UniProtKB/Swiss-Prot annotation:
The modification N5-methylglutamine is found at residue 155. This is Large ribosomal subunit protein uL3. GO terms for biological process: translation. The keyword Amino-acid biosynthesis does not apply. GO terms for cellular component: cytosolic large ribosomal subunit. Belongs to the universal ribosomal protein uL3 family. GO terms for molecular function: rRNA binding; structural constituent of ribosome. Transmembrane segments: none annotated.
Length: 214
């Protein structure tokens, strides 16, 4: 299990920066509003250790009474989401309910994992969804250029096995990209810049954590 405190941010989009040698490096900009600590869970009271945070804003009319009570107890403003990070005893030191966690949690050159919700593509065929090769363009092939082809064997087993790769819904699922390097940490603007691409559409929420494969 990933036992490390992280941050919840928002994907701003991609750009590029140039190194001193003039090499173009593709980067993604992540805006990180202060993560407000709403609850600290301990082994004694909850059976596990975690730091629960919220970020952003939410209209009061969109907040349930249970959520209002939870945020009020912590003394923080209601956020657009709530996220927990499982942590060790050492990482709980200095953390208190009502406090904040910012981009200074990370340093330039640190390797991180970024989790987000991938872009939804809707219902897609086997060629796009699973990288199947297409059938013959000619030689007697009619209206079957992108169809799957055979999906089973013969009378035995006489069925299609579960999990067979077929056309279906693509994207809109939780995806983690591992091993991304932090290129810049801007504490004034509360912005992280990481090397490479991260999952999701512009404006989507992402979770940034120290890499699990250190």
């Amino acid at each position: 299990m990933h036992m490390a405190i992280g941050l919840v941010g928002r994907k701003c989009g991609m750009t590029r920066i140039f190194t001193d040698a003039g090499v173009s490096v593709p980067v993604t900009v992540i805006e990180v509003d202060p993560n407000r600590i709403t609850q600290i869970k301990t082994l004694e009271t909850d059976g596990y250790q975690a730091v629960q945070v919220t970020t952003g804003e939410r209209r009061e009319s969109r907040v349930t009474n249970a959520q209002k009570g939870h945020f009020a107890k912590a003394g923080v403003a209601a956020g657009r989401l709530v996220k927990e990070f499982r942590v060790t005893e050492a990482e709980l030191e200095g953390r208190e309910v009502g406090g904040t966690i910012g981009v200074d949690l990370f340093t330039v050159g640190q390797i991180v994992d970024v989790t987000g919700q991938s872009k939804g593509k809707g219902f897609q065929g086997g060629v796009k969804r699973w990288n199947f090769r297409t059938q013959d363009a000619t030689h007697g092939n009619s209206v079957s250029h992108r169809v799957l082809g055979s999906t089973g064997q013969n009378q035995t087993p006489g069925r299609v096995f579960k999990g067979k790769k077929m056309a279906g819904h693509l994207g809109d699922e939780r995806v983690t990209v591992q091993g991304l390097e932090i290129v810049s940490v801007d504490t004034e603007r509360s912005v992280l810049v990481v090397k490479g691409a991260i999952p999701g559409a512009t404006g989507g929420d992402v979770i940034v954590r120290p890499t699990i494969k250190a």
